């Protein structure tokens, strides 16, 4: 039970995704077609940052803060586009747990107690409450904007409203039934800095935040070497760091 909660908590606050690649200068978004409005051009520039790489493998060091309890371990993150997201946790060189997402379901493996659990996304409370399915999680791990329930964000760009604030521009998605989505980007580069998901109801105090930083390159495109994820409300508060 504790390992299952720990692994699900690992979703809740990711940071430090190490990479051996070097940092490169990030280009400002290019001007779009002449007929596009400035807002359309900016939205297109954000989407254009999406990765062309189909696979990512990285070693990680994870520091987890769950309800005031600090846990540290190593591991690896493996992703294959539209196929799998796998987070393996190790201690003293041995795998102690695994969290695996596929388009169909979620697998949690507890090596210590020799237990595993496989469930649909609707059966995992945290994922259901945050309206997260495989393709939404994939976008979060790959540092991409998304629209819940759709795999083609390009066809949904008219749903986003832009709001500028200092050095950042937010893409706001407020027409979803129960949740509001804010995608905070760096105006100078159109890079996604943070995703915030809030409930629409005043009675729903839950908030899910996924932050990105320390951008490196992956197949010639910027990719965050630092991810930090946190969740509060919904009866729990937790966070963790991947490095």
List where the protein language model places each region:
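N-terminal leader/targeting segments and the immediate start of mature chains
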Residues: 20-71
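Edge/loop elements at the starts and ends of beta-strands within beta-rich repeat scaffolds
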Residues: 48-56, 68-71, 78, 82, ...
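Hydrophobic lipid-interacting interfaces of membrane-associated proteins
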Residues: 63-65, 92-94, 109, 113, ...
């Amino acid at each position: 039970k504790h390992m299952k909660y720990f692994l699900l908590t690992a979703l809740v606050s990711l940071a430090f995704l190490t990479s051996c690649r070097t940092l490169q200068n990030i280009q400002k978004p290019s001007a779009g077609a002449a007929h596009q409005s400035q807002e359309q051009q900016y939205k297109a520039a954000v989407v254009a940052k999406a990765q062309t790489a189909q696979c990512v493998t990285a070693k990680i060091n994870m520091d987890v803060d769950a309800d005031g309890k600090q846990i540290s371990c190593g591991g690896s993150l493996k992703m294959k586009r539209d196929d799998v997201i796998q987070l393996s946790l190790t201690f003293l060189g041995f795998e102690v747990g695994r969290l695996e997402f596929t388009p169909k379901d979620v697998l949690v493996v507890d090596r210590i107690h020799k237990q595993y659990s496989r469930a649909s996304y609707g059966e995992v409370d945290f994922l259901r409450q945050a309206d997260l399915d495989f393709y939404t999680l994939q976008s979060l791990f790959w540092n991409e904007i998304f629209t819940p329930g759709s795999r083609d964000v390009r066809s949904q760009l008219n749903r986003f409203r832009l709001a500028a604030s200092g050095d950042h521009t937010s893409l706001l998605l407020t027409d979803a039934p129960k949740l509001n989505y804010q995608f905070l980007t760096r105006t100078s580069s159109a890079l996604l800095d943070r995703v915030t998901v809030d409930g629409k109801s005043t009675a729903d105090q839950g908030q899910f935040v996924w932050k990105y930083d320390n951008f490196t390159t992956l197949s010639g495109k910027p990719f965050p070497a630092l991810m930090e994820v946190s969740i509060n409300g919904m009866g729990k508060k937790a966070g963790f760091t991947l490095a």
